[in-house]
Amino acid sequence: MAASFVIVIVISFFISLAFMCYVHYTSRQRRKLHGYGHEKAVRLPPGSMGWPYIGETLQLYSQDPNVFFASKQKRYGEIFKTHILGCPCVMLASPEAARFVLVTQAHLFKPTYPRSKERMIGPSALFFHQGDYHLRLRKLVQGPLGPDALRALVPDVEAAVRSTLASWDGNVSSTFHAMKRLSFDVGIVTIFGGRLDERRKAELRQNYAIVEKGYNSFPNSFPGTLYYKAIQARRRLHGVLSDIMRERRARGEPGSDLLGCLMQSRAGDDGALLTDEQVADNIIGVLFAAQDTTASVLTWIVKYLHDHPKLLEAVRAEQAAIRAANDGGRLPLTWAQTRSMALTHKVILESLRMASIISFTFREAVADVEYKGFLIPKGWKVMPLFRNIHHNPDYFQDPQKFDPSRFKVSPRPNTFMPFGNGVHACPGNELAKLEMLVLIHHLVTGYRWEIVGSSDEVEYSPFPVPKHGLLAKLWRDDSVSVETDGCQNGDNDDNGVAMV
């Protein structure tokens, strides 16, 4: 009896001790989350954390995400907290804050993605890392994406543009899908040069499309789900890439394209060659980064030009002069000519600002960080809101107006970041701009198009594009290339469809 009593006392003691430890731990966490007890008595930014577990995720996805963030900024200011996608977050909507996170104190904020995304792309992909590995790999990737490489790539980009427009000619198609095809083809030629046969290209295209469909699906590995199919397709992609690398080694010709540079690079740990897995992860990462973002911007450019006929005619005149200098389009575009498209370049910059395809980026605080008297706790997600900055009237007058002339003067520092900022800014931004310039040249000098249905609604897949990908009919019209004077302000057919 006495022994039983002692056992009960001992068990009760340990239960009480465990409960006290739990209470102490949760109390500390509570104080930390609410900013109490911190050495400098800083507090969390204002904001709302929403419901337990789900936070404000439902509010985010029940409306336009940009409206959600804009309303939060209007209520709480340029730094505020929320809880979305299962994570406590601090949102930053000022140029100074974005620079703080992405440039001056970038070492305190690491790139962060869900594990399911890393598994889909590959854990060794450039944009999942920071530090020495990231810097070595970024320097390597910038070579095949630099000015010298792009100068040699102009004919290939032009061929891809011509092919895309020719396949669209006379048909009603989703602009976004057409632009995705273009961006994929440009990505393939950048990665593999002109050395990839059609069978391999078809294998890559087919399996990448499956990976893309499953990328934003719920990470359920049960057979038959989109995620499961995507993981299987990702393995097949790795197999195709491994075969290509093996064939190149057998020939003793790794090549000077992006794949060849990765195969020969000693960007691995301790100066070692990259493994085939590391090379494959980065190739798939480049394909992913190069396609949907660029295709989304190209889709918006087609819409913005359509919606502003006087601007379209001015762009058409600029491009017609270049076409005339190329013997009516019989000679290819040159790198120098793409550098001379002043108005067209401003249209691209304004499209990047207006659409703000990359609305924000994710980082994670690796330590408790203080910014302007507020605490950003270790482990919290930090999101610089690019779109909020791009649409702030303090930095861009009348921000909802599409006005390329605003770029006659350079924007204030850190107010225009369509490709990010700092060491993690997109290394392929100049390739993307080249693709846009060449597409616009051939689109406005050789074709007319009409938008089918409404183009005012926006959908996210995952980047913002007009609903249904902007359905449009395109047809060849060589007469437009000689209209260097005057303005056609657009016509309306009997069905009220604007034609340009």
From Swiss-Prot:
Induction, per UniProt: Not induced by ethylene treatment or flooding.
EC number(s) given by UniProt: 1.14.14.137
Positions of heme binding: C426
BP GO terms, sorted: abscisic acid catabolic process
Membrane-spanning intervals of the chain: 3-23
Subcellular location: Membrane
Required cofactor names: heme
Listed pathway(s): Plant hormone degradation; abscisic acid degradation
Name the UniProt record assigns to this protein: Abscisic acid 8'-hydroxylase 3
Organism of origin: Oryza sativa subsp. japonica (Rice)
